[in-house]
Amino acid sequence: MALTYRGNVGDLKYTVTGNIATNKNKVVDLAGSDDIISNGGDKIRFILREGEPIGSFYGYKTDGLYTQEEIDAGRFYTFGRIPNAGDIKYVPQREDVKYYGDLEANEDKSHAAISGEDRTIIGKDVPDFTYGVNLNLQWKNFELSVFGQGVSGTMTAFESEQISAFMLNANPREFHRGRWTQENPNPRAIYPRIYGGHSLDDYNQYFSDYQLFDSDYFRIKSISLGYMVPINVVKSWGLSSLKLFVTGENLFTLRADDKMKDFDPESPSGRGLSYLGSKSVAFGVNVSF
């Protein structure tokens, strides 16, 4: 849907155009097949499930990072091993899973274990809405044009930055300073406890909503300010017309998730190796003889 409104206030003329589109989809029939789980990268998982939208992320729900107090009190779940402070706190989806410290002495330790059965849909990478706005203002010899666009209702997963932020070609950015350490035992730290080695099977590397970013954004894609030199002045210079202008691209972006501040919200889910989108400013002159 698109709407345009034109008007003027004295010498000021304006045109405002807005558009919005929605994308609603769901898997209707898998022809008798079970859920289809696919690998979108090193660890990213997608699921096709009847009644759910295409592009649904499939993984573990989390609740921050474990504190040392929780570990000491036995208020944790195992996931292949006993976690340490600073490890991701995976949340079981099965009702019969207990805290490790609540198990009876002779009880099976698997009753406190997270497993693949605890995976669930944790988000999607297809936006609910895409929208844009275009503003044009004219006042005497000046003209201002602004174009912005954004999306709402979508998530992004960056494997390199969340799963292996300090290896290969990943961009560490704020992860080094904001990661969990014994000196910074923040249960909501941007990156969990770090372990040595080169294994992608580390406790903190299972695909989960801890690795998802809210990628809703609104970006000023372009802004242009122009000035048309008065015709009497131009003619005295032997010209037909002369316009001076300055144009900027990608100068300003609003993000729903502060964790996205070092990433380009227009990047798709995947490796996440690219740096922020470039900004540019250009000055120009249009001359007619």
What is each of the regions a protein language model found here?
Residues R6-G123:
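Conserved small-residue
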Residues G40-Y66, I71, Q182-R188, Q205-S208, ...:
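C-terminal beta-signal and terminal closure region of outer-membrane beta-barrel proteins
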Residues M1-Y5, V133-W139, I223-V229, K235, ...:
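Residues on the lipid-exposed face of transmembrane beta-strands in outer-membrane beta-barrel proteins
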Residues V151-K243, G248:
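Extracytoplasmic gating/loop element in the C-terminal half of outer-membrane beta-barrel translocons
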Residues L12, P127-Y131, D216-K221, G277-V281:
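Residues that define the transmembrane beta-barrel architecture of outer-membrane proteins
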Residues G7, I20-K26, W139-N141, G150-T154, ...:
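Transmembrane beta-strands of outer-membrane beta-barrel pores
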Residues T15, N25-D42, G153-Q182, L254-D262:
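Outer-membrane beta-barrel and related beta-rich outer-membrane complex signature
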Residues D11, N141-S145, N232-V233:
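Repeated loop/turn-to-beta-strand initiation elements of outer-membrane beta-barrel proteins
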